Amino acid sequence: IYRKHLKYIGATSPGELCNESYVAGVGTYPEDIGLEGLSMVITQLIGLHIGLTYDDVDNCSCPRAPCIMQPEALSSSGMKTFSNCSVHDYTHYASKLDMQCLGDLSNVLQPKQSVCGNGIVEGSEECDCGNETECQFKECCNHETCKLKGSAQCGSGTCCTPKCELSAAGTPCRKAVDPECDFTEYCDGSSSHCVPDTFALDGHLCRLGSAYCYNGRCQALNDQCVSLFGKGSQGASYACFEKVNSQRENLANCDSKNSYSLPCGQKDVLCGKLACFRPNKNYKSSTQSVLYSYVHGSVCLSIPPGLSMRSDGKDNAYVADGTVCGPQMYCINGSCKEVNFTGNDCNAAKKCKGNGICNNFGHCQCFPDYRPPDCNLQIGSPGGSIDDGNLLRTDSALATKRLSQHADSWVILGFFIFLPFIMTLFLGIIKRNERKIVPQKEQER
């Protein structure tokens, strides 16, 4: 439950973990704490539920203060541990019969059975190309049994060829959708499925430092306007955003998750509905409803919510998450938040030696001629990371590449060495033939 002002962190039934009538709890999400603080709220509620109590700071201690079951833990950052009092409480509670339900495995949920035909390889399935209509690998995979046919190596996936063979290692299987914030993934030669998506760590600077990468895309305000209103449109001024997002009307909303009107607070004006300058003075939209606002002699464009939805459920009428809203700040869920890097330990300058950037797995995405995982110099390396599936950066592959390059170089060098010799020989033959022809003509005279 979200609460703007904190009066309590939640409610649960202390020590009633195995009581089916009370095995529940409710936690609050105060405005002034981040995800780390919320995780402590949940941890403390679970602790109370299994019989722990709040620590007495005078009698309880832990290796690094504050301890988990202390109220101060909600507002502090960094690793935390349980105190000696919490360990004692748990040992005492676990020794009683009140926790015997934890040893009862009769009600453990069984893994979901695989469903043949849903396009997802599960359980004992060898392949799953979808139902009869969807299956594009009918020569490779039996869509009714999800078993491979004959000698087929694969029967589904982006790294499976029409000949039922695994794609060669290094074959691109997912192209980058953004030149700065997303990366191409490759088949690894051993799986028919592409590796998980890799992209720049959220908060990485793009567009010459004017925007942030977020979820694999450079969230530049101008790009969002171009996608809605066409080439030439640009992000509007602060005055336009204030006009569009501060009025109390049905179409002024800083919270796209709710159906009611919620004008933006002053600090969140740039994170509400998207406001853009028109591409040109004669701009008219024939494909969608456009709202026109006039501010200080400028025309600001916006659209009503719900008319331009993305495949991920987000509404293009609103500023995208990750868009800059101030110095070291970007928009998250309609609010202007400080860019927070406390959740990752990847420092590109140190970990990648300045020869790459951090990706969403916290690993280095190296520039060309630098080899992962540490981005050490290696001429000929395609760069990338240990996560993108490209195995063609191994020592043997690079050695083969260099030998091939050297062989080509020797062929070219040999050609240029022997070319003058061949030309000299050819010219000599021509001269000799000319000398033979001249005496014959003199004898004929």
Swiss-Prot record:
The keyword Cytoplasm does not apply. Residues 431-445 are cytoplasmic. It comes from Rattus norvegicus (Rat). One of its GO terms (biological process) is cell differentiation. Glycans are attached at residues 19, 59, 84, 131, 333, 340. Expressed specifically in testis. This is Disintegrin and metalloproteinase domain-containing protein 18. A tripeptide motif (ECD) within disintegrin-like domain could be involved in the binding to egg integrin receptor and thus could mediate sperm/egg binding. The lineage of its organism: Eukaryota, Metazoa, Chordata, Craniata, Vertebrata. Residues 1-106 form the Peptidase M12B domain. The chain crosses the membrane at residues 410-430. The keyword Transmembrane helix applies. InterPro entries: ADAM_Cys-rich, Disintegrin_CS, Disintegrin_dom, Disintegrin_dom_sf, EGF-like_dom, MetalloPept_cat_dom_sf, Peptidase_M12B. Residues 113-202 form the Disintegrin domain. The gene is Adam18. The prodomain and the metalloprotease-like domain are cleaved during the epididymal maturation of the spermatozoa. It is a single-pass type I membrane protein.
